[in-house]
Amino acid sequence: MPGIFFSHPNALKEVTNKPDEVMAQKKKNFAVPWKNYLKSMLPHLETIKSSSSSSSSDTEKNKLTPNEIIQWTMSLEKLLVSEEGQAVFRAFLKSEFSEENIEFWLACEDYKATNDSEELRCKANVIYQEFIQPNANKQINIDFSTRNSVTKDLLEPTKATFNGAQKMIFILMERDSYPRFLKSEIFFRLAERHHGNNMRG
C-alpha cells in the first residue's frame, strides 16, 4: 500500500457540527482502558468478525487475530493498513455522517498507485468533482489554500496533486474520529461479542 501521511500542520480546523443524537451515542465510558481490555481478552479470542452490517460481508470472509485488533488501537496508520480495519472504521464514520473522509483518503491511495498518465488525469478530475470542488456531493473539510492548490494542479495533475489535502484529512481523522472510534459501540461489540462466545464455549 502506498505511503501514509503522519506529519501534523501547525493548525487544522476540526469538524464538530455533528447531530446531537449522534454525539450522544458516541459518549460511552468503559471500566478499563481499551488496550488493557483487549489484551486481557487475548487468551480467549480466536477470531473476531465485524458486527457492523455494512462491513460484515467483507470482514466475515477474513478471520482476524487478536493481535491484529490490538494493532488497530496503536495508531490510525495501523488501522488503515488492514482492509478489515478500513471496513470497520468506514462503518463508524458512516454512523457519524463523515464517511467522505475515508472515501477520499482511499481514493487518493488508489490515485497515487496509478501509472498511466491519461488514467491519472481522469481519476484526478473524478476526485476533484466528488470531494474538492465547491458544493461537491462529498465535499471534504480542507482550507482555501489547499483547495486552490489542487484546482490549479488539475491542469497538469501529478501523483502529488492531492498530497496536501490527503494529509489534512488523515490528521482530521487521526485527531477527531479515530479516538472516538476506539470507544465506539461498533468497535466495542467487535471485540466483546466474540469474547463472550468463547467464554461460554
From Swiss-Prot:
GO terms for cellular component: cytoplasmic side of plasma membrane; cytosol. GO terms for molecular function: GTPase activator activity. InterPro entries: RGS, RGS_sf, RGS_subdom1/3, RGS_subdomain_2. Regulates G protein-coupled receptor signaling cascades, including signaling downstream of the N-formylpeptide chemoattractant receptors and leukotriene receptors. Inhibits B cell chemotaxis. Inhibits signal transduction by increasing the GTPase activity of G protein alpha subunits, thereby driving them into their inactive GDP-bound form. Its main location: membrane. PANTHER family: REGULATOR OF G PROTEIN SIGNALING (PTHR10845), REGULATOR OF G-PROTEIN SIGNALING 1 (PTHR10845:SF34). This is Regulator of G-protein signaling 1. GO terms for biological process: G protein-coupled receptor signaling pathway; leukotriene signaling pathway; negative regulation of signal transduction; positive regulation of GTPase activity; signal transduction. It is a peripheral membrane protein. Keywords: Cell membrane, Cytoplasm, GTPase activation, Membrane, Signal transduction inhibitor. Residues 75-191 form the RGS domain. SUPFAM superfamilies: Regulator of G-protein signaling, RGS.
